[in-house]
C-alpha cells in the first residue's frame, strides 16, 4: 500500500491539477471515487471521515447499501442525469446500461440523455469530476488531459454525446465522456449506429458475461477491472492521440487508473482494452484518434447509438478499419460499461469474486500491482491490454493466471505487501482465514506443516516474521497480541507489560480454565502452564501437548480452555498455583493470616518487624532469588530456599516470600511497597518498591537476576531496620516506580514463590470472580 499510495499521491497531485475537486482527495477518497463514480467525492469524504478513513469499512457500507448517497438540491442536475442514468442502469446499472448502450434501450432514452446532457453537459462532466473525483485521475483526468483536444465538458465537440456517455452514470460513461471528448464529433458522427449496435450486442453479451462475472466476482472488482479497461482504453486511446501531446498525459491518465484502486484490480482487463490503442499508436496519430474515437464511440454508441446513426456513417470506413481491433476493445468497453454501470450500482460486488481470484478487495495490493503495471502506461500497458482485451473474462477468471502478471507487476511491491494485504492476492483467502487461525496457533508445527501446504509466503510469514503475520493477519488480533508471547512466556509478566501485579502464568495454570473464557485472557499468555487454550499455545506451542493443543488447533477458545482446564486440573494439583490466578493473594495481604503469610504481611508487610525475616531471608533469598529469577516462576526450589530462610525468621516459612510478591511488586497498589522491603529496594531501581528485602531478592531474581537479589539482600539487610518508609527512602525513592516496572517481568515471581502452598484456586475464586 505504502508504495502504491506514495506514487498514487503523486499521481493524484498531478491529476488534481485539472480538477480542484480531487486536489484535496486522500488516497482512500480517490480509490472510493473511482470505485463508486456515482458518489460525490465530498460524500465519500464524509463517509471516510466518519469511519476513520477506513477504506474497507466505507466500501462495505456502500456495497451493502448500509449508506446511501445524499441527493441534495446541489445534485438535482446530477439527479436528472442519474435518474436518466438509473433508468438506463436501473436493473443493474450494468445490464440495462449495456442494453441501452447496445441500443437495446430505445434511442429515445439515449436521446434524452443527449438532450439533458447537453443541458447539463457542463454539469454532468463536473459531476463526473465529483463522482469521479478519483476518476479524474482516470476517466475525468483522461478527459481533462484530453481537454486540450476537447474540453472536459467536451462542449466543443458534442457535449450531448459526451454527456450521453456520462448519462450511464457509470465509470464507462465517464470514460465515454473522455472518449467523446476527443472524438466526440468525429467518432459519434463517424461511427454508424450499426457499429454501435454491434457494440451494443457485444456489450450485451459481455454485459451478460459481466453480469455473471458480477455474480461471480465482486462488482467492484469487475467494475474496476472492466471499467479501468475502458478507462485505459479511453485514456490510452486518447493517450495515443495525445502521444503527440506530452506522453505524461498518457501515462498520467492510465497511471491514475492503475494508480487508482480500480485500475489495480483491472490491470489485465485494462490491457485488453488498451489493445486498440497500440494499433493507433503504431498507426499515425489520426488512426489512433479514430480508434480512440471508435473505442470511445463504442461506449458512446452503446449509449447513443441512434444519435450516432445520422452522424456516424461517414466514419464507417474508419471505424470498420479499426473495428476489428475495437470490437475486442468495444466488447471490453461494453463490458466495462455494463460492468461499470452495474458496478456503479454494486461496485464492490463484482470486485470481490474477481478479486478472490485476483487479490481480495485489498485495494492496496491491487493498486500496487497496478502501480507496477500501470505506471508505464501508454503503449506498454495498451499492448498488455490488447492481450487481455481479447479474453477479458477469461482473464478475470484467469486473473489467478494474470496474477502472475500482476505478481510480476507487483514484484516491485514486496511480496510481503501482497501477503499482508490480504493473503488476499492469493486465492488463499480461505487459506488466509485458516492461516489466521492456524497462525494464531501457527507455532504448532502441525499447523505449520498444513500451512506449508498453503503458500510458501504464508509459511515464511507465519514462521519467520511473526510481525509480518500480524501485518498479514492484520485483524487477527490474537495473533498480533499473542505471537509475541513465545519469547515472553519465560516472563509471564512481561507479556502483559501493563499489569505488574499479575502473574499470568498462574492463569495459564487455568485454575478456572473452564470457569470462563475471560479467565483465559491470561491463558492467552500461554504461561508456563502451557495451557491457556489456543492462546497459551502461542507462547507454549511446541512445548506442551495438552488436549488444548490438540491437532485441531482451531478449536473454539472455550473448547481449548476446557481441554486445558482438564489437563490443568491434573497439573494444578501437581503444580502449586504459584499465585492465585496470577493475581496475588490479596486475601493474604489484606488479612494477617499467619497461614497466608501473616508473618509476611503483618510482621513484615506493614511495619511488622521484618528485620529478622528479611535478614534471615535475604542472604538466602538473594541466592534463592537468583536461582528463582533465572529458573523462573516454576522453580519451587528457589522459592523454597528463600522460604526456608524466611521460615527461620518468620516462622511462616515461604509466607514471607508469599507476602513479598505483593510487597515487592506492590502487587496491590500502595501496599507493601512503601513499608515493606523497599529497604531492599534501596537496591536500586531494579528492585520494586514493594519488594522488600525478600521481595527484592525475589524481584531481583526475576528482574535483575541473582545480582540484584544479592544487592537487595545486602541493602535489604541494611534497610531491614530501615523498613517501612525508611526502606523506601533507602530504597532510593526509585523503588516505588521502578520496582513496579521491573517487577512486571517478575510476575513469574508468583510461581517463584511456590511456597505459597496454600495456592488453592478455590481460595481465591470467591473474591476474584
Swiss-Prot record:
Keyword Membrane: no
Compositional bias per record (Polar residues), positions renumbered to this chain: 545-557, 760-769
Composition skew (Gly residues), residue ranges: 641-654
Highest rank taxon of the organism: Eukaryota
Compartments (UniProt record): Cytoplasm; Nucleus; Chromosome, Telomere
Pfam families assigned to the protein according to its UniProt record, in alphabetical order: CUE
InterPro entries: CUE
Compositional bias annotation for Basic residues: 1-12
Family (UniProt): Belongs to the DEF1 family.
Complex formation: Homodimer; may form higher order oligomers. Interacts with the large RNA polymerase II subunit RPO21; the interaction is direct and serves to bridge RPO21 to the Elongin complex in a manner dependent on transcription stress. Interacts with RAD26.
Name of this chain's protein: RNA polymerase II degradation factor 1
Species per Swiss-Prot/TrEMBL record: Candida tropicalis (strain ATCC MYA-3404 / T1)
Taxonomic placement: Eukaryota, Fungi, Dikarya, Ascomycota, Saccharomycotina
Gene from which this protein is expressed: DEF1
